């Protein structure tokens, strides 16, 4: 059992997968200048699948219990709100006092969206890319919006088979929404990447995996490898072998996000149903579990820390030490990443854990 989580078996491999997810994001953001980690955005989609699976599993376990909704939302608040709002306050009000290099004015002018977890809608309607400091918070907004509704659906519908169909139909609706946006020439990165109704594929797939396990369906057992072969081949040929980054977006807009989410869903399914040596070796190792444990703080902190410190380290190394630009960037990225890891460990141990222990009151 996880501390503070009701009736949930602990799967070390899921923490390992969470570690994979955060490392993908870090490689994309902190080492993006190498152009080797263009696929790092997949880390967010893996987070979505894991979140959908774990949250749905918890909701199914507790849906018949007293104070079901209160307990769920209080646990959610205790996990997300303290660190989220601490970082928000720090970035909005303290960073500008000590550092004027980051453009925080965009967020100050539109801060109501951030306080209400609706900033991804803001990013869709008003271009945020000139001020990236808190852009990564979009994924937290998508999750919170989904979980405002999903617990009520589970409470009302109850039956896992019906919930599975609802999840599937929602997944199809997301794909149709993206196709329609493309058809009407709303070919905008923000719509495809940040819009709630085009980016909940992973959460839906994760929910479906939890429901498939609940009803003990054999569909994945029978067709798993066929699905993996087709989707992995499709993604490899159309996405990874495509050197033109601009032409990858149409594929993602139509089916790419969904196909990657399904592959991650199968990975989660294997992580919780197989106790194989390979799964343990790949995902239940101490290194990935460590990064999985600190993943929330690491995700929240890494981007502001990078934007604050990376230019300073790079300029110091290229100026004072006359290093080549590429070498200076690489060393600076490593230093900044280590600093973010240290901050995340301190945050988990001395800040987040205080609130995580309170979750036991709402089990």
What name fits each language-model region?
Residues 1-202, 214-229, 273-277, 287-289, ...:
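Membrane-cytosol interface segments of multi-pass membrane proteins
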Residues 253, 257, 261, 265-269, ...:
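Feature representing long, continuous alpha-helical segments
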Residues 279-281:
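Juxtamembrane membrane-water interface segments of multi-pass membrane proteins
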Residues 221-276:
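Alpha-helical transmembrane segments and terminal signal-anchor/GPI-anchor hydrophobic tails
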Residues 209-211:
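Acidic/histidine-rich catalytic neighborhood
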Residues 236-242, 297-312:
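Hydrophobic alpha-helical transmembrane segments in multi-pass integral membrane proteins
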